Amino acid sequence: MAEQAPEFMGPSDHPLDPPSREEIAAAGSLLKKRLGDEVIFASLALIEPPKRQVIEFESNAQKTPNQLGRMVCVQGYDTVKKQSFVATVDVTANVVTEIRYISEGQAPLNFPDVVRVITICKTDEGWQNAMRARGVEDVTDVQIDPWPTGGYIHPNVPEGHRAMRAISFVREDKFDNGYARPVQGLIAHVDLTDEKIVFLEDHGVVDLPPEHGRYQPEHQPSLREAPRPISITQPEGTSFKVDGHAIK
């Protein structure tokens, strides 16, 4: 017998349950009304109620539904003001209670940032010329990996701007393993606030590795024998119980 969490979990039954799909959607909708549809969300987490209230709820043997208000903390990037923010949303009352803009540091980087870096690089003339110098004319399938700047932010990036670094890998098509052909000595320093490459670090042309790194069976000289079947079962049923988000 398999124990599986339900595909969809509705409103919270316990005050410490993680935010449900409904609560996440509500928080996103409320913030988009305040900040616009182009706002970028980086993270969302439950703001736990006071411990005293949780103990009181549990000491009541959970005989009554969760009556405690549900609050979430959302970090993101306001594309209009071009600033990171931290917001508090009451998803029980359906209201944004606070939006605080970050003066030092940034909200966590996220997938929309990655997409923006790739677009900025591939449309930059300087980056395109650097790829041509390495024999790459068509950059459609070039793989670009954006990385956080860490403690090393290029001086051309203004203070307070959102930034990443990008390195490139050459692929023959979208199914190729780009990591077999790194473009060595070329790093793009990207200012995400102004959406441009502020410095292209180019240490000179290094020949691309000639061999591919594909994993598909048709590209291998031979294949190993497939492993024999393995089964892990509890024929008499599970020895644990799933109760909401608790495993007992």
Outline where the language-model segments fall.
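Basic/polar N-terminal segments that are highly enriched at the extreme N-terminus
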Residues: 1-13, 29, 33, 62, ...
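Intrinsically disordered, low-structural-confidence terminal and linker regions
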Residues: 1-23, 45, 209
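Extended, regular secondary-structure scaffolds
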Residues: 2, 102-248
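Acidic/histidine-rich, surface-exposed loop or edge segments in extracytoplasmic proteins
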Residues: 5-15, 94-105
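Interaction-mediating elements
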Residues: 22, 26, 30, 68, ...
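Short amphipathic alpha-helical segments that mediate assembly, nucleic-acid/protein binding
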Residues: 23-24, 39, 114
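Short N-terminal secondary-structure initiator segments
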Residues: 31-51, 209-218
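Exposed beta-strand-loop-beta-strand "reactive/processing" segments of non-cytosolic proteins
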Residues: 37-91, 138-191
